[in-house]
Amino acid sequence: MGASFLNLVTTKVTVKGEEQKFVSLRLHQRFNRHHAFTVIVNYLSPSNTFKQTPEKFINYVGETVSISFAHKQTGESYDFEGVVTQVEMVGSMGEAGGVAIHGASPTILYENNGTLDSWMDQTLSAIIKEATQEYGKVPLASNPKYSAKIPYMAQYNESVFDFMNRLSAQYGEWFYYDGKKVYFGKPDKDNTEKIMYDVDLEEVRLVANLVPGKSARYDYVAQENKQHNADTPAKPDGMNDLQSIAHDCSEKAYGAKTTAAANPHIADKAGLDGQMKVLKNESGANLLNIRGIGKTCRIRIGEVIEVSFPGDMNLPPLGKFRITEITHEVRRDGHYANTFAGIPDGTVNIPVPDAKLPLALPELATVKKNDDEKEQGRVKVSFDWQKNGKTTNWVRVQSPNAGVSDAVSKNRGWVFVPEVGDQVMVGYEHGNPDRPYVTGAMFHSASGKGGDKNNKTKSIITRSGSAIVFDDETGSIVITDHTGKQLILLDGKDAITIMAKKSVVITNEDKSVIVMDEKSIGMQAETISIEGKKNITLVSGNESMVFSSEKNIINGSATNIKLEATKEYDLNTQTGTMKGTNLTVEGTANMTITGGIVKINS
C-alpha cells in the first residue's frame, strides 16, 4: 500500500508579497512551452469578494507569483516563480464568490508580439544572448551544444519565445523553464530521484510507440557549388535496451525513406550529417515514454527519476527517465498529486513537435555592398527593418540566364550585379527567412521614368552612363558611351551611323587599319582596292578627279595633274593620244621612240 502521508503538503502562494489563502491550485509545466497556473482564492460570498477593491486585484497583473510545495512529513519541496497574466473576480448564484489568479512562467514575457531581427556570422549562443537582452526579468542560462558560426539567421515575425523554440527544434537544443531559470541547451545538472511504485507513484505506464525514423535531407552550398545529401544514422544515440527493441520494430514497419530540404541551411557536409543525427535522436526520444500519477513533488520538470518496484513484487527497475511534462495539483486540505510524462534519460535531442516555422514572403531591400570577396556576383542587402548597420550576408542574384559552357568558364549569360544603393526585391529559398536571394531590382519615383510615350523606349544603361537604347516607334538602336558623343546608330531606315568626337579606328588582327580623326582619314594595308561600278570621284577643296567607267578617262578639274614613278611608268593602250598646246617629252639621259612606223611632224 502507498504511503498516504506523502500526499499532504504545505503550500504557500504569494503575490506582491501577500500570501493568498487558496481553495485549489494547478500548475502545468512542459518543455518548450510556457508553464501555466491557476490559483482559486475563496472569499465565501460575492459580497466578500467585491468588498475587495477591483484595483487591488487588477494591480496583481504582471506581478511575480511565488509558489512552493513542501511535504509535511519528509520536507521534500519544490519552488516555482511565475507572472500573473489574468485576474478574475467571480460571483456565482448569489452564494459563492472568489478570485481566480491565472499566470504563466516568466517565459511569457518573451511573447512581446512578433518582431524582425537578424544576425550574421554569429554563434547560437550569441544570437540567443542578443535576442533576449531586453528581457532581463527572465533569468536565462544559455549553453547550446551547437557552437559553429551561423552565416545568417533571421527572427522573422516571431516573438522571442517562438524564435527560441524554433532554434531549439532546428538545432536540437533543450529549451525549458525549471521553476527558477530558463535553460537553452542541456543544463549541467543530472541529479536523480529514486521513485518507487506504490510508494511515490499511484500509477505508472511504460509506453512504446511506432515512430518513423528514416529520412534524407539535401542542400546546395552555392559559394562552393556543392550539392550535399545525407541520410539519418542507423540508430539514435543513447538508447537503452527497451528503446532498441521499439526502434527495431519501427524500422521494420516503416521501410520507406522520406526526403526534404535541409532546415536549417548548412555550410558543409558535416553540418548536414549533424542535422541528420539530431533528427534521428529526436525520433528515438518518442520510441519509449513513461507516464504516471505521482504523490511526491520530488518529480520535477527537467530532472531524472529512476523508477523501481517494491521488493515483494520481484520486478526489475523500469529505468531512468527525464521528466518533460508535469502537472501539479493541490486541494484546500493540502492533498497533493501530479501527473507526469518523461523520456529515457539517455535522450540527446528532445523533439519539439509543433515548433512554428515562419514562411518568408518577398520584400524590398537596399543593396549595401556588391564587392563580393569571392567574386561570385553576390551582394549584401539591408531590409527596412534592419537597424544599427545590420545587413544580410552575401546573397545570390537571380538572372534570366546564368552558367558556364565549353567556351565560357565564368559569366556566361546575363551579368548585371545591382549597384550599391539600388532597391531590390528579395525572395527566400523554400520560404526560409535564413535563405534570402535577390530576385530583381525595382525602380521608384527617384530612379525610373518609364518607357516614354506609348512605352516606345527600351534601354540598358550602366552606372557610368553607357547605353543601348531601342526605339520601337522608329525601329532604331543607339549605342553610346558615357559621354553620349560617341555612338553607333542603326536608324531603322537602312542606315548605320558611326560617330566619334575625335577618331574612329577600324582594324583587324593583321593590322590593316582605317583611322578617321578630326582632320584626316588614313588607310593602311598590303592591298587597298576601291571600286565604283560607274564612277569614283575624289575631291580636295574645290578640285576634283573623276574615274569614269563609261568614258574610260581620268578627268581632273585641277590646273595640274602630275603622274610620277621613281623607276618605271608604263602606259599601255590600243589607241592613245597625248594633246597639249605645248607638249614636251623629255628623257634626261636618253629617249627612245619605237614603233612599226614612227611619224614626226607628219
Can you say where each PLM-predicted feature lies in the sequence?
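Amphipathic alpha-helical and helix-coil boundary elements used as assembly
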Residues: 1-602
